[in-house]
Amino acid sequence: MNITTALPLPTHLLSEKVTAPLLGARKIYVTGSRQDIRVPMREIALTPSSARYGGNENLSLVLYDTSGIYTDPQATIDLACGLPRLRTAWIDERADTVEAKLHFKVPESVSVTAPPFPTPPQPLRARDNVAVTQLEYARRGLVTPEMEFVAIREQQRREQTVENLRGQRHAGDAWGALVGTPITPEFVRDEIARGRAILPNNINHPESEPMIIGRNFLTKINANIGTSALSSSIAEEVEKLVWAIRWGADTIMDLSTGRDIHATREWILRNSPVPVGTVPIYQALEKVDGHVDALSWDVFRDTLIEQAEQGVDYVTVHAGVLRDFIPLTASRLTGIVSRGGSIMARWCQAHRSENFLYTHFEELCEIMRAYDVAFSLGDGLRPGCIADANDAAQFAELEILGKLTHIAWNHQVQVMVEGPGHVPMQLIKANMDKQLAACGEAPFYTLGPLTTDIAPGYDHITSAIGAAMIGWYGTAMLCYVTPKEHLGLPNLQDVHDGIIAYKIAAHAADLAKGHPAAQARDDALSKARFEFRWQDQFHLSLDPEKALALHDESLPKEAHKRAAFCSMCGPQFCSMKISQEVRDASSSELSDANTDINTSDGI
C-alpha cells in the first residue's frame, strides 16, 4: 500500500496500524446492476470444525464495512489527491447541476497556518428551480444508483447469512418498525420518499459511499471529531477520521472550533468515504471573532453555502430554540448545554428578536435542496443532566422541530431530528414515542442518552446503556460518546473506545428488533467459542486485536490457540469442554442402548 501526504508531519500520517486490514478480514466488493456500483463489504473466512465437533466446513461471514479503501491492500492512498470520486458519473447523468458561481476564497486579512488541500474540486449546485435531493428523486419514483448501492449494502447477502444460522433465531420486538422486510432498491426509495430514512450524499462529496439512516435499516453510529482552539491539528483530525471509520463509524461530524476550520473540513471531506456533518454556527461565530451579538443571518447563510460547496452532507441547525422557550430553562440544574443552543439563546436575548434560523428556515431549505444537504435539526434545549430530563423546554423544542421537519419535506429536503442527552432509563422510551409522533417518523439521531451522571471517564459506558435502549425503540443513528466526554478533546484511543461501545449498543438494538442477519455473527462466534476455534473468535469480534491481546496476556503460545481451555478456568474446569464430554458420553450411551435393543431376543 502506498501512502503519501502533503501535511507537514515528521512521519507518514496514516500508519500501518490505521490502514492494515482488520485481523482475519478480507475486503470484497459486490457489484450491482451496473459495473460502477461496487459495494464494499468485509468477509471473514472461518476454519472448519474439528472432527470432534463434526468436521464440518464453516461458511464465511459477510459484514457491513465503513472503512473505505483504507483497509484494501490493493488501493493506493494519497491524501493530497483524496479518494476516488465514485459518484461523479451518477451525478453527471442526471444533468440537473451546474458549476457553482460562489466559491469560498480565504480573505487576505485572515491568517492561515494550515496547508490548503492541493486540488479542491469545482463545486456544483442545482440548476435554477430544481431540487437535486435523493428525497426529490424518490418522490418522483426514480431509483438512483445511490439507492441501489444502499440496498445491496443493507441486505448484506442476508439470504445466505440467515440460511447459515445453526441456532434458533429469536423473535424481536421492533416497536412497529419494518425490520425483516427484504431490502430492495424499491424499498429504499419508498422509505426515503416517506421521509422515514435519509441518504445523506451532497453532490459535492462524490467520494462518499452511499449509506442510509432510518429505523427500518441497520442502526448507525456517528463519531465526532474536530479541532479546538486549544488542541489538535488537521493531521490529527484526518487520522481520527480514518481511525473512526476503521472501527465502524457510519458518519462523522467535524465539530472544529479552532483555526483553519475551512482547511480542516476540506482535507476531511476529500478523504472521507462516509457522510460528513457539521454545525455551521461554530464557523459563523469564528467569522465574527466569537462575538455572539455580531452573528447575523447573512453570516450564517454565507457559511452554509461555503460548507455546502465543499461537500458537507448534513448540518445541525438549532432552529427550534425559540425566544419564548429560553425562560423554561431557568430552573434547570445545568441550563442550556448545547453549544449551538446556548449561542442562539444568547443571540435572541441580545437582539430581543426571534431566532434567525427559525425566521429564515424556508430560505435555509432553498440552499439545502440546491446541494442535497440534509438537515439534522438540533436539540439545542436537550437536557444536560438527569435532573433536567424530559422537561418542558426539551419537549417544547421537539414540537417545533416536528413542524420544521414538514416544512423541509415540502421543499424536498431530507431531515433527521436530534435527541438527548442525559435521560434515566425509565424516561427513555417517552423520548422515542414523542419524536415519532411530533416528527412524522423522520429518523431520530440521539447523543446517548447518558443514563447516569456519576461516571466521568466512563461516559462511553453510561451512554451506551441508553443508546442500546433507544436504538431498540427506534432511534436510527446513535452519536457516540467517548471516555473524555465532559473532560477534554478525545484522542485516538478515546475515539476507538467510544466507537466500540456504540457498535455494541447498535448491534444489541438490532438484535432486540429482530434484524434477520444480526444474530448470525453472534451465532458464528458462539459456535467458534464452544469448539475452541480461538482464531475465529478473535476475527469475529468487534475488536479482534484486543481480543487476541487479552487472550495472549496469559496464554501467549501458538499451541494455546488450539487448546480447549482459557486461563480463566484452565483445562480441568472449562464448562464448555465438560459440556462436550457430557454430550459425547450421552451419545455413546444412546448408541449402546440402541445396540442392546437391536440385539435382544425377539428383535
UniProtKB/Swiss-Prot annotation:
Gene3D superfamilies with a match to the protein in the record: 6.10.250.620, Radical SAM ThiC family, central domain (3.20.20.540)
Keyword terms of this UniProt record: 4Fe-4S, Iron, Iron-sulfur, Lyase, Metal-binding, S-adenosyl-L-methionine, Thiamine biosynthesis, Zinc
Binding residues annotated for Zn(2+), in chain numbering: H422, H486
Catalysed reaction equations from the record: 5-amino-1-(5-phospho-beta-D-ribosyl)imidazole + S-adenosyl-L-methionine = 4-amino-2-methyl-5-(phosphooxymethyl)pyrimidine + CO + 5'-deoxyadenosine + formate + L-methionine + 3 H(+)
EC number annotated for this UniProt entry: 4.1.99.17
Function of the protein: Catalyzes the synthesis of the hydroxymethylpyrimidine phosphate (HMP-P) moiety of thiamine from aminoimidazole ribotide (AIR) in a radical S-adenosyl-L-methionine (SAM)-dependent reaction.
Quaternary data: Homodimer.
Cofactor (UniProt): [4Fe-4S] cluster
NCBIfam families in alphabetical order: PRK09284.1, PRK13352.1, thiC
Domain of life: Bacteria
UniProt similarity note: Belongs to the ThiC family.
Glycosyltransferase keyword on record: no
Name under which the protein is recorded: Phosphomethylpyrimidine synthase
GO MF term (any one): carbon-carbon lyase activity
Keyword Metal-binding found: yes
Residues noted as binding substrate in the record, renumbered to the chain: N224, M253, Y282, H318, S338, R339, G340, D379, G380, L381, R382, E418, Y445
Gene Ontology cellular-component annotations: cytosol
Free-text cofactor note: Binds 1 [4Fe-4S] cluster per subunit. The cluster is coordinated with 3 cysteines and an exchangeable S-adenosyl-L-methionine.
Known pathway: Cofactor biosynthesis; thiamine diphosphate biosynthesis
